[in-house]
Amino acid sequence: MKPEIRDWLQNNYFSVAQPVLKNGADIYPLILASQQGRADVVRFLLEQDAALDVVDQYGNNALWAACYADNSDCIGALIHAGVDIDHQNAVSGATALIFAASTGREKVVGQLLAAGADTTLKTHDDFTALDLAATRKILKLLSMLVKSGD
């Protein structure tokens, strides 16, 4: 184990002996490493057979966390390892694609689409990634129009 990975595990209260297990705060290392954009740690954890189906307290998987971090290396490693690209969280029903589209992460959306993410899945409120991406663009235009009237 590389020293920087050992340090990361220890600094985040994970077991060096059992690095894929969650810490005392009920956080999985794969999700935290993905959220922090630590592709080196993500790859290490995947090599240690980290479970791909773990979720955080909101029901999001590691792919969602990597999309949040806007980190293509983490996203690619997780997809290559076989993470559920279309996982829908229990709270809203959103997928990583829906999240990425709703927050304007164009590069991430492209990466997820290239990997085969399902564009027809909907949130519990009946929104698709396209619906939320369109809403985001409209809000951007509204903001521009309001500012031009000042």
Region spans (language model):
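Ankyrin-repeat inter-repeat connecting loop/turn
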Residues: 16-19, 52, 85, 119
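Intrinsically disordered, low-complexity regulatory segments in ankyrin-centric signaling systems
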Residues: 1-36, 40-43, 47, 147-150
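Ankyrin repeat boundary/linker residues
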Residues: 22-23, 56, 89-90, 123
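Conserved hydrophobic site in ankyrin repeats
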Residues: 20, 45, 78, 112, ...
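Start-of-repeat signature of ankyrin repeats
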Residues: 26, 59, 92-93, 126
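Ankyrin-repeat-protein effector appendages
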Residues: 1-11, 115, 124-127, 131-150
